[in-house]
């Protein structure tokens, strides 16, 4: 025998079915970052007003070894389930929502919520990711099902506002009730 010699098993093991059989469990165990939850306004909002709540999630990629093979996985956010903390939920929905400029806070959005009572509410989001994988640089294959990844809850304080009308003219009577120079006799 002269030259290089290749040694291989006459019946090499096909690892793709074995990788496919365990890929969904491995996908669930990846360190996928859940969506970041943001509320506007925050950490306080008003009862009866629209509170814009939105998710920020991105595609995440991982290179792992499964059964001795190089596997590239990608996790893509596809749906969100919003838990507003007052017994109300939205979703699953593909709507991630998004930030509003401060001068538009209070506007209704696809993911906003109106709180009907005051108090502290634990707001959270469950993000569903769809995955694909490629073995040893091969084609991307879908991972069956989705992975569910919860965001840590954030406490949102819902306050009430009181509006009062005053008849005093603060330029004439700077110490009048409701004027900057007024002091509450009860304090």
Residue ranges of model-derived segments:
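Extracellular/lumenal mature domains of secreted and surface-exposed proteins
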Residues: 1-187
């Amino acid at each position: 025998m002269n030259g290089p010699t290749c040694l291989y098993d006459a019946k090499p093991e096909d690892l793709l079915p074995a990788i496919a059989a365990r890929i969904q469990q491995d996908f669930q165990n990846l360190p996928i970052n859940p969506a970041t939850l943001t509320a506007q306004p925050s950490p306080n909002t008003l009862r009866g007003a629209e509170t814009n709540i939105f998710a920020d999630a991105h595609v995440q990629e991982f290179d792992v070894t499964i059964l001795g093979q190089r596997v590239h996985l990608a996790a893509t956010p596809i749906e969100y389930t919003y838990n507003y903390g007052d017994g109300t939920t939205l979703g699953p929905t593909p709507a991630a929502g998004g930030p509003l400029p401060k001068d538009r806070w209070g506007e209704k959005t696809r993911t906003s919520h109106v709180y009907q009572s005051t108090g502290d509410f634990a707001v959270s989001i469950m993000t569903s990711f769809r995955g694909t994988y490629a073995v040893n640089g091969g084609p991307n294959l879908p991972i069956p099902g989705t992975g569910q990844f919860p965001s840590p809850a954030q406490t949102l304080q819902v306050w009430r506002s009181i509006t009062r009308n005053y008849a005093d003219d603060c330029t004439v009577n700077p110490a009048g009730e409701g004027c900057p120079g007024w002091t509450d006799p009860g304090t």
